[in-house]
């Protein structure tokens, strides 16, 4: 697995962890970055923002 793929996976796992443990209302770039151990800038670079990140998480989990 490439570094970027590994990092994206960690970020998406952080989203899931926050939803499961803290609730959807606690989702934010700061919380996700801290949980994933990455910078906020990296999240914006990889996903464009919180909306795209949540959309990617939901697609990955096949919620739709």
Each language-model region and where it sits:
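Basic, helix-initiating cap at the start of DNA-binding domains
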Residues: 1-22, 26-38, 52
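Short hydrophobic/aromatic patch on the recognition helix
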Residues: 37-47
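Alpha-helical DNA-contacting segments of helix-turn-helix folds
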Residues: 52-61
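Intrinsically disordered, low-complexity segments enriched in small/polar residues
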Residues: 22, 42-44, 55
């Amino acid at each position: 697995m490439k570094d970027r793929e590994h990092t994206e996976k960690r970020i998406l796992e952080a989203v899931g962890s926050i939803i499961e443990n803290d609730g959807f209302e606690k989702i934010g770039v700061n919380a996700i970055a801290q949980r994933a151990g990455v910078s906020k800038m990296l999240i914006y670079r990889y996903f464009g923002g919180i909306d795209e990140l949540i959309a990617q998480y939901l697609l990955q989990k096949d919620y739709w």
